[in-house]
Design a protein with these regions (language model features):
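Conserved hydrolase catalytic core segment
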Residues: 140-179
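Short beta-strand/loop motif that positions the catalytic acidic residue
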Residues: 262, 268-270
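Active-site loop/oxyanion-hole signature of alpha/beta-hydrolase fold enzymes
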Residues: 110-145
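Hydrophobic, aromatic-rich cap/lid helix
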Residues: 230-255
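Catalytic active-site module of serine/aspartate enzymes centered on a nucleophile-bearing elbow/loop
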Residues: 292-324
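Flexible "cap/lid" loop of the alpha/beta hydrolase fold
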Residues: 168-197
Length: 324
């Protein structure tokens, strides 16, 4: 990068040309070490305890999409992962974001109050649902955050409809095609809720070994659980549909090549001890997306927002504040 920049200057190039070269190159620093911060429900100042917080809906051609909105500032839209509900977000992570931004979390189609009129759909359909929510709410300067499968939805939206997105955060996710590493088969069996799967097994794939015990005690207490949300289960048909679209995503080589067309500033977040989607996936995304930066958290697992809710949120806020 330095050689290219110096060559441009030597040939009479402007400082703006040099900056363009530097900004277009993915960046990656050494892993960051955050202080463990599982709250375990002890702090009652959390967004899901706010009076008047209520589930709302937008109408899409496929049916209603349910969401919650709280906080003030430029909007952050968060898309969750495989077989996940709104409750799988960490309440304190969302609360930290909401100190500076409007936070919108939604359920993917077929989950909770979000409707699915069809049983077969692809990543583009989930991206279209998110886009419809953004359009309907007339959001501007949106930061799009996708976790795990939600990061794949976010990539799809960025490739197809980037005009409403100011910047993006891809957290513990994977690129399409063969650009990264697949979820290990034994891990997928646990995440898919195979018969006999225990809560402890789920925690063992979401957290590194030294955090498992505390996660078993704190995970449910730190979940985002508004009073009107209730106990939401993921229907078997939705799980099967998501299995199918994940398979299609992994086979889509054309989409991987289209990642280079993403022009918005993108923060790629990775967990060093992610047993679900290995850090190689984040490295591949960082290499493929021109205006991306990579932050890897040491001693962190797939659900690292539960280990470091405030530090992770603050890193995202810093990215939003400094992105062009």
């Amino acid at each position: 990068v330095i050689r290219t920049a110096m060559a441009l200057l030597a040939r009479g190039g402007s400082i703006y040309m040099v900056l363009a070269v530097c900004l277009a190159v993915p960046s990656h620093a050494a892993p960051v070490a955050w202080k463990e911060d599982m709250v375990c429900g002890k702090d009652l100042n959390r967004p899901d305890h706010q009076p008047g917080l209520a589930q709302r809906y937008v109408v899409t051609p496929n049916g209603a999409i349910a969401y919650y909105s709280f906080g003030q500032g430029s909007p952050i839209v968060l898309v969750t992962g495989y077989r996940a509900t709104i409750s799988n977000w960490n309440a304190y992570f969302l609360g930290e974001l909401a100190k500076h931004h409007q936070v919108i979390v939604l359920d993917n189609r077929g989950i909770g109050g979000s409707v699915s009129e069809t049983t077969r759909y692809g990543m583009a359909d989930l991206a279209r649902d998110t886009l419809t929510l953004i359009w309907t709410l007339k959001l501007r300067d949106v930061t799009l955050v996708g976790w795990s499968m939600g990061g794949m939805v976010a990539q799809t939206l960025l490739m197809q409809h980037p005009d409403r997105i100011r910047d993006a955060v891809l957290m513990n996710t994977a690129p399409p095609g063969h650009g990264g590493d697949a979820v290990p088969a034994d891990v997928m069996r646990i995440l898919s809720g195979s018969p006999g799967t225990t809560f402890g097994q789920v925690m063992s794939v979401l957290f590194p070994p030294n955090a498992e015990k505390q996660a078993e005690q704190c995970f449910a207490r730190d979940m985002f659980k508004p009073a009107d949300y209730g106990s939401v289960r993921v229907p078997a048909q939705v799980a099967q549909s998501q299995d199918a679209l994940l398979g299609e995503w992994a086979a889509d080589k054309q989409a991987f090549r289209r990642l280079r067309g993403i022009k918005v500033p993108t923060l790629v977040l990775s967990a060093q001890n992610d047993a679900v989607l290995a850090p190689a996936n984040a490295a591949a995304l960082n290499k493929a997306i021109p205006r991306s930066s990579l932050v890897e958290a040491s001693d962190a697992g797939h659900a690292m927002m539960y280990q470091y809710p405030r530090a992770l949120a603050q890193r995202i806020i810093k990215f939003i504040d400094t992105s062009l």
